[in-house]
């Protein structure tokens, strides 16, 4: 596409609409997705770690198969008033149409790599992926090892038989909702409703979409997130009870659903203590570990340390260092920047002060 036409599309694109919603379907599905990474991310809500540990091997496997291998067949492409309504619609959907939607999403370009207003086109005719060898080779090229061949191979066995795929998806999601998430959803719903009410009450009119996202998430966003936010024409910001300090997303066409850990916006007051407790638990969880405290202690003594310096000084493995630094960075206790090929970190004293202030306000001392 000529550069001039791309410029025109960007200039003529409508302004971004931003709203705060609970989004039960997106919220519940993402909580189920977190069960697949409970052993990789520290700082997730206790429900996630406890539920992940309680799953049988078969259910744990099926959770990955449905929410990773068949992900785009279950991704909501619109808002739903309840998870049950989403499930009913999914159950009534044509299995072949679901499969074709999965293949179309898989083969289209990453939308955040494209100018705003430009629709992605398939990188390969979707129907070619019905051949397993073609599918597995294409995955190896596209994801460069960042996928599970066993899960993807089994997913392929299902989506070449759409009715079988559909039956697995419906059975698994209905079971997970009924046995694990329905009671938990009722418990956290009042807190999520309060979060949405408080965020809606703030004045966001003078900020662009990227500025709103930074303030809501309380994070300096990486280019990956910035690209998606700047391209989206409809952004729905969704508080999650289970996400901890991390971010999550769903996208479809020009719509982006961005999930963040439920908390209060700066300066706002909660009408109940649940929302403040939730935010405190996320912040204090990052401090409730000897290795993470040692990392903060080191950064308090020096202006900046790179990841390899921390690994050497604390004699810890690279995966352990990465996991701890990811949580500290997401919580805001450290700032991250690139120095050549290295990730380097500095202490964010302001965030530590904010945590102390939040604890004082909560305890009323």
Residue ranges and their predicted role:
Residues 213-341, 356, 364-365:
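Extended mid-to-C-terminal alpha-helical interaction segments
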Residues 37, 41, 289, 304, ...:
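Alpha-helix boundary/capping and short turn/kink residues
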Residues 48, 60, 292-293, 352:
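Short functional linear motifs
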Residues 1-229:
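N-terminal, charged low-complexity regulatory/assembly segments
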Residues 341-360:
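Basic, amphipathic "hinge/linker" alpha-helix immediately C-terminal to the N-terminal HTH DNA-binding motif
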Residues 59-63, 245, 353-355:
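Short amphipathic alpha-helical segments with coiled-coil-like heptad repeat character
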